[in-house]
Curated annotation (Swiss-Prot):
The protein's name in its UniProt record: Transcription antitermination protein NusB
Native organism: Campylobacter jejuni subsp. jejuni serotype O:23/36 (strain 81-176)
GO molecular function: RNA binding
UniProt family annotation: Belongs to the NusB family.
SUPFAM superfamilies according to UniProt: NusB-like (SSF48013)
Highest taxon in the source lineage: Bacteria
Keyword Transcription recorded: yes
Keyword flag Membrane: no
Gene symbol of the encoding locus: nusB
GO terms under cellular component: cytosol
Extent of the signal sequence: none
Function: Involved in transcription antitermination. Required for transcription of ribosomal RNA (rRNA) genes. Binds specifically to the boxA antiterminator sequence of the ribosomal RNA (rrn) operons.
Lineage: Bacteria, Pseudomonadati, Campylobacterota, Epsilonproteobacteria, Campylobacterales
Matches recorded under Pfam families: NusB
Length: 132
């Protein structure tokens, strides 16, 4: 059974693939099969993924307000995907903020460049503070 962390890694992969080929969703099942995401975890993954896509404009507008010199579209694909996942969980789910931040930082350490964890932490922390 996949862990929640592995599920979030899969969501990042799905968002990345979506940006490269949004016209064809055939990649969804391929990615989930490859990462052995099944049953309840597959449902959790798809709920996160579709929730992000359904709220993408709102998420991006919110994130843009916390990006000083950049727009979300100017960031790298991986950083953008991690921020979108984190923002979605903070804005639309009951996942505790500390877990969202920790997961986003860990994903950034694993998948993005060396400066990304600090950057992602700063943006999501600002979002949490503004939400209070």
């Amino acid at each position: 059974m996949a862990t929640r962390h592995q599920v979030r890694q899969s969501v990042i992969s799905l968002l990345y693939a979506f940006e490269l080929n949004s016209q064809n969703n055939v990649f969804v099942d391929e990615i989930l099969d490859e990462k052995k995401i099944r049953n309840e975890q597959k449902n959790f993954t798809l709920n996160l993924y579709h929730g992000i896509l359904d709220n993408l404009n709102n998420i991006d507008e919110t994130l843009n307000s916390f990006l000083n010199d950049n727009q979300i579209t100017a960031l790298g694909h991986v950083e953008r995907a991690i921020l979108r996942l984190g923002a979605y969980e903070l804005l639309f789910t009951d996942t505790p903020s500390a877990i969202v931040i920790n997961e986003a930082i860990e994903l950034a350490k694993e998948l993005a460049n060396d400066n990304s964890p600090k950057f992602i932490n700063g943006v999501l922390d600002a979002l949490i503070k503004a939400k209070k």
